[in-house]
Amino acid sequence: CFAAENTDIQSAENCKGFSETTRQISYPKGRDLREFFKWLAGVIDGDGNFDVRSVNSQLVLKAIRIKLHDRDIRILSYIQNTLHIGRVRSDKNKPHSIWIISKKEEMFYLINNINGLIRLKVPGLKKSCNYLGIDYKEANYNFGPYDPYFAGLVDTDGSIVFNYSGNRIECNLEFERNEFSSKLNFDNVIPNYKPAVSF
C-alpha cells in the first residue's frame, strides 16, 4: 500500500518484449517521516536483522538488513526511495531480496529514528545503540488506533484471509512467544474490535 504512492512504473518495448523500470521519486525537503519510521520499525521487527558481531572481543554493528521474498521487493524499493540510503540486493539462487545498510553514518541515522519503536528485535537494537553511543529507548507496547507499526508487521509477517465459514476477513500475525512478543497489546489498533490471541 505504501509503495504504490511513491514509485512510478514505466514500461518500454524492446525487441524481446516489454521491460519495467521502477523510478525513484523525490520528496520535498523537511518531509515528516515519523509515521514512516513507525511502519519501518514493524517491518524490521518482522523480517529485519541487526548484524552485530564480535570483532577482537568487541561487539561491532556490521549492517542492518531487511530480507523479503522477491514478490515484496516493492517494500524494499519504497524504503530505499524514502530514506535515500542503502542498497537492494537480490539473491541469484533464491527468491529473496535484501535491503542493506552498512555505512556507520547511515546506521546511526536509522537507529536514531527507530529507537523507541522496536519491540521484538530489542537485543539487537540495544547492542546497536551501545555500539553507536546512542541511549536505548524502550518502546510503548500499547498501540493506538491505526498504528503504522502494525501495518509493517502485517506487510512482513502477516496474512489477510477471507474466513468463509465465519463470513469475515481476518488479519493474522504469528509470533514466537517470548518476553517481548508477550508484551504486545493490539487491543486498540482496530477501533471497536479486540483481537483474538491463541497460543
Which residues does each PLM region occupy?
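Internal intein/HINT superfamily modules and their associated LAGLIDADG
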Residues: C1-F199
